[in-house]
UniProtKB/Swiss-Prot annotation:
Lipid anchor positions (GPI-anchor amidated asparagine): 276
One GO-annotated biological process of the protein: cell adhesion
Sequence repeat boundaries on the chain: 55-60, 61-68, 69-76, 77-84, 85-92, 93-100, 101-108, 109-113
Region listing for Disordered, in residue ranges: 114-263
Region (8 X 8 AA tandem repeats of G-S-G-A-G-A-V-A): 55-113
Membrane topology: Lipid-anchor; GPI-anchor
Organism: Plasmodium falciparum (isolate tak 9)
Protein name, per record: Merozoite surface protein 2
Polar residues bias spans: 169-195, 202-230
Residues annotated as signal peptide: 1-20
Compositionally biased spans, kind Basic and acidic residues: 151-167
Primary role: May play a role in the merozoite attachment to the erythrocyte.
Domain notes: The N-terminal region appears to be involved in lipid binding.
Glycosyltransferase as UniProt keyword: no
Gene: MSP2
Highest classification ranks of the organism: Eukaryota, Sar, Alveolata, Apicomplexa, Aconoidasida
Length: 302
């Protein structure tokens, strides 16, 4: 009987020790899981909504970019393009591409042949028609066409001195049409200086001036693209918000701060799981101790 009692007591202690170890492991894992869940919940509550931040950043970027693009582009396209086109006596360009094509090309062609050098036109023979190229897109091409037209006019004036009386009539018609176009230009472009096309001016000085005036229009057409790039502030705000969010990712809630201070009464629902798990572990240990004392008392006194 004594051997049975001793063996039962030894088995009981072994069972109690294993049970306590298992309960402690289970309680520790439960506590760790509950703590991790509470931390995750508090982090989700403390984080700002990332979708709203990204949306506001993109909205600011697209707004600034659209304002710069449409505003400056529309001003440079419609304002400067229309001025260059109508000033040359051609169709007014409505866009930025029409400024270089129709505006500047028509300046070199019509200015060289008709308006700038009418004296050389009077000396030109009817057998040699005026050949001027109007399909120019750059300022260098405009300058080259103007110089070529001047050289041709000068050569015609030297080689054909006899055809003055025959060609003056169409030149007078050209002068009348040019005067009408000048009146229309003055009415349309009041802010710009009108191009002088008098019969007394034999040197084509208006062509380089208009070629130089067409150069800022090309620069103005390229300026909205350059201006719209630094005003796109969407990416900076987007990265700044993410950076500020990543700088302090471990913001704890007020309930966790109060729990760390020791005020367990003010703990939230997330940390109540910790108290429940610790209470369950302590209750299990208490039950094990009571059962151990009862078994020992029966084994000793029986």
């Amino acid at each position: 009987m004594k051997v049975i009692k001793t063996l039962s007591i030894i088995n009981f202690f072994i069972f109690v020790t294993f049970n306590i170890k298992n309960e402690s492991k289970y309680s520790n894992t439960f506590i760790n899981n509950a703590y991790n869940m509470s931390i995750r919940r508090s982090m989700e509550e403390s984080k700002p909504p990332t979708g709203a931040v990204a949306g506001s950043g993109a909205g600011a970027g697209s707004g600034a970019g659209a304002v710069a693009g449409s505003g400056a582009g529309a001003v440079a396209g419609s304002g400067a393009g229309a001025v260059a086109g109508s000033g040359a006596g051609a169709v007014a360009g409505s866009g930025a591409g029409a400024v270089a094509g129709s505006g500047a090309g028509a300046v070199a062609g019509s200015g060289a042949g008709n308006g700038a050098n009418p004296g050389a036109d009077a000396e030109r023979s009817p057998s040699t028609p005026a050949t001027t190229t109007t399909t120019t897109t750059t300022n260098d091409a405009e300058a080259s066409t103007s110089t070529s037209s001047e050289n041709r006019n000068h050569n015609n004036a030297e080689t054909n001195p006899k055809g003055k009386g025959e060609v003056q009539k169409p030149n007078q018609a050209n002068k009348e049409t040019q005067n009408n176009s000048n009146v229309q230009q003055d009415s349309q472009t009041k802010s710009n200086v009108p191009r002088t096309q008098d019969a007394d001016t034999k040197s084509p000085t208006a062509q380089p001036e208009q070629a130089e005036n067409s150069a800022p229009t090309a620069e103005q057409t390229e300026s909205p693209e350059l201006q719209s790039a630094p005003e796109n502030k969407g990416t900076g705000q987007h990265g700044h918000m993410h950076g500020s969010r990543n700088n302090h990712p471990q913001n704890t809630s007020d309930s966790q701060k109060e729990c760390t201070d020791g005020n367990k009464e003010n703990c939230g629902a997330a940390t109540s799981l910790l108290n429940n798990s610790s209470n369950i572990a302590s209750i299990n240990k208490f039950v094990v101790l009571i059962s151990a004392t009862l078994v020992l008392s029966f084994a000793i006194f029986i």
